[in-house]
């Protein structure tokens, strides 16, 4: 929170929370989310909650929806079918507005106008949303013991940590890992040079 607070200025209008996180795979605890919500309240910021990985959780990690915590600030939550339901080609998602909507009437009106003028949903995919959300949750077969995503996470994490000078925290959610390179072994000056050296 100290880093977020240090980077907040009078020009800061919103905060983005990706939970589970891309690229680290972190799943934020309730206290962290409460602190973010309180910070947003103190600075009158919108909260944008990207929760596309909310069902991809490992090792009993718990996803807490930001909208359930940020009751005093406008919280715009994004989700969709592409990750947990493996339907990326459907291009089907949604957003939920929760919290204090009274102070955001103009913003909400703008979203309504934009959706009426410029956006056209994938109608067949819209019908799939109800079935996906209310039906059998096949993602569980992939994230529980013996599941492909869990096993791939465990193997990738072990392989990364077996490389001298590379360490990685085991992700609690999503489908990413964020390794750390020991600067004593890998004297990388910047990420562009690292890619060029590879």
Stretches found by the model and what they are:
Residues 1-198:
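PLP-dependent class I/II
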């Amino acid at each position: 929170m100290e880093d977020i607070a240090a980077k907040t200025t009078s020009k800061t209008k919103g905060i983005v929370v990706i939970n589970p996180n891309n690229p680290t795979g972190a799943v934020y605890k309730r206290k962290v989310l409460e602190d973010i919500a309180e910070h947003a309240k103190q600075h009158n910021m919108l909260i944008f909650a990207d929760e596309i990985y909310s069902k991809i959780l490992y090792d009993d990690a718990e996803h807490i929806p930001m909208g359930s915590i940020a009751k005093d600030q406008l919280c715009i939550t994004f989700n969709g079918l592409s990750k947990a339901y493996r339907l990326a080609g459907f291009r089907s998602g949604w957003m939920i507005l929760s919290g204090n909507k009274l102070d955001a009437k103009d913003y909400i009106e703008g979203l309504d106008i934009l959706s009426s003028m410029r956006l056209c949903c994938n109608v067949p995919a819209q019908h799939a949303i109800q079935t996906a959300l209310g039906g059998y949750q096949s993602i569980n077969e992939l994230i529980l013991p013996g599941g492909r995503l869990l096993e791939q996470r465990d193997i990738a994490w072990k392989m990364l940590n077996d490389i001298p000078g590379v360490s990685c925290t085991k992700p609690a959610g999503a489908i990413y890992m964020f390794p750390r390179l020991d600067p004593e072994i890998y004297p990388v000056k910047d990420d562009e040079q690292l890619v060029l050296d590879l």
